[in-house]
Amino acid sequence: PVAAQPAPQFAAPVAATALATGSTLRHLTNNIQGFRLAGEIASTEWPVYVTGEQARLPIKFQVGYLSAVSVMPEASYLSLSVNDVVVGRVNIRATHSVKTFTIDIPPNALQAGFNSIRLTAEQRHRVDCSLQATYELWTQIDPSQTGLLLPRSMPVSRLADLPALSPDAQGALPIRAVVPGRTNLANVERIMRATQLISLHGRFEQPVVDIGPLADGEYGVNLVVGPASDVGSLVDLRAAGPITGPRVLIIPANPRLRTTI
């Protein structure tokens, strides 16, 4: 086998415990490569959108993972790259249960808009250097424990920043379609068209739509479509001012309600 190279020096990753007070874990979307890193060298990458305000903050990235018992911890690494720059590296040491760690993302590494986030595994076998043994090397990323750690005090407040909405732990973006007033075919068709529009505008990789009352929670979005008199019975429209024609309003998430459009 190839001799392992010494790891570059980064700020030491920290074992993650409970989320810090006031923080929320922004999960990653499902991607083509998936969450399993198999073989000696493997990587998986996500496009991640951050707002201008978020990009200016010190942000951490949390990773939850589990690896095969055949992976040699002393010569195997999991590295995090942001926009093609490696910002952290840790030995792979999670052979019996899922472990989590956090890496500080340096200032100015993230830019307002879409960014590339990549996890790369370099894996060496404990005892076997044969080609067949490489099929025994794998690291599984736990999507429920992986993503950006962001302040709860910075919810999405602009339509332009819809791509910054957080998916759920399975990587899907829940959309709760709310039909105020009478439920008829015309209203349902109208809200389904609006659902398609926000999914395209927000570039949601995996939108999951259901219909019901306004929903709470940290992930996803409520979508309410209807006459102002009906919509106003469900949400506070005072911030919209006088409504004399079609309007789009985004209400930031709060402890009672997820982000609402």
Task: Go through each PLM region and give its residues.
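Solvent-exposed alpha-helical segments and adjacent loops
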Residues: P1-I261
